[in-house]
C-alpha cells in the first residue's frame, strides 16, 4: 500500500504558509489505518524496551495499538492539568508562547527503556520535551517512531543522538 497517498494536505492551515498533513483520512480508511499500525509495529519491534510513551493526543492514537500488539505498557504525556496524580513537568516553546507537558511521576522507573510514538515529526520540539520528561524520571529513550516525517523541516537533526524512525517521509511542502 502506498500510505503516502492516503494523507490529505490542507494548505494554509492552521495559518498561512503551512502545509498541514491531515491524518484523519488514514484513520477513516480501515485498511490504511491497519497498515499504519502494522508499519509502526515493524519499525520498533526489534528494539529492546518496556514502555511506549504516547504524547497527547495523536500519540495516543498510534501508541496504544502498538503497545497492545507488542505487549508493552503505555505512558501518556498530557498537557498541564489533565493528569489526576502527581506529575513531573517540562515547559516548552510554541510559536506564540509556551506550554507545559506532564507525565505521572511514577510512570517510568529509573533505567526503564522506552520508545516514543507520535503521528508526525516536524521540527522535533515537542519530542524533545517528551524526551526531557522521560529522562527526568530516569528512563532511557531507545527509539522514536513517527507515522509521518516532514524531512524538509529538519526535525531529525534536532533529535541527533536518538534512534529516529518514520513510516512515511514528505521531502517538500506543497506550498
UniProtKB/Swiss-Prot annotation:
PROSITE patterns reported for this sequence: PUR_PYR_PR_TRANSFER
Stored InterPro entries: Ade_phspho_trans, PRibTrfase_dom, PRTase-like, UPRTase/APRTase
Pfam family, any one: Pribosyltran
GO biological process: adenine salvage; AMP salvage; purine ribonucleoside salvage
EC number assigned by the record: 2.4.2.7
Biochemical pathway: Purine metabolism; AMP biosynthesis via salvage pathway; AMP from adenine: step 1/1
Intracellular or extracellular location(s): Cytoplasm
Catalyzed reaction equations: AMP + diphosphate = 5-phospho-alpha-D-ribose 1-diphosphate + adenine
Cross-referenced Gene3D superfamilies: 3.40.50.2020
GO molecular function terms attached to this record: adenine binding; adenine phosphoribosyltransferase activity; AMP binding
Primary localization: cytoplasm
Keywords (A to Z) from UniProt: Cytoplasm, Glycosyltransferase, Purine salvage, Transferase
GO CC, one annotated term: cytoplasm
Function text: Catalyzes a salvage reaction resulting in the formation of AMP, that is energically less costly than de novo synthesis.
PANTHER family attached to this UniProt entry: ADENINE PHOSPHORIBOSYLTRANSFERASE
UniProt xrefs under HAMAP family: Aden_phosphoribosyltr
NCBIfam families named in the record: apt, PRK02304.1-2, PRK02304.1-3, PRK02304.1-5
Subunit structure: Homodimer.
Family to which the UniProt record says this protein belongs: Belongs to the purine/pyrimidine phosphoribosyltransferase family.
This protein's name: Adenine phosphoribosyltransferase
Gene: apt
Amino acid at each position: 500500500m502506498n500510505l503516502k497517498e492516503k494523507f490529505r494536505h490542507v494548505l494554509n492551515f492552521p495559518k498561512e504558509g503551512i502545509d498541514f498533513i491531515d491524518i484523519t483520512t488514514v484513520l477513516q480508511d480501515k485498511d490504511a489505518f491497519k497498515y499504519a499500525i502494522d508499519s509502526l509495529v515493524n519499525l520498533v519491534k526489534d528494539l529492546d524496551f518496556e514502555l511506549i510513551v504516547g504524547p497527547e493526543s495523536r500519540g495516543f492514537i498510534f501508541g496504544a495499538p502498538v503497545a497492545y500488539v507488542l505487549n508493552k505498557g503505555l505512558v501518556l504525556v498530557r498537557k498541564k492539568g489533565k493528569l489526576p496524580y502527581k506529575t513531573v513537568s517540562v515547559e516548552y516553546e510554541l510559536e506564540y508562547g509556551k506550554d507545559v507537558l506532564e507525565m505521572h511521576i511514577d510512570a517510568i522507573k529509573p533505567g526503564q527503556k522506552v520508545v516514543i510514538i507520535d503521528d508526525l515529526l516536524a521540527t522535533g520540539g515537542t519530542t524533545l520535551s517528551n524526551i526531557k520528561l522521560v529522562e527526568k524520571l530516569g528512563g532511557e529513550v531507545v527509539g522514536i517512531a513517527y507515522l509521518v516525517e516532514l524531512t524538509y523541516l529538519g526535525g531529525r537533526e534536532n533529535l541527533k543522538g536518538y534512534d529516529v524512525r518514520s513510516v512515511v517521509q514528505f521531502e517538500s511542502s506543497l506550498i
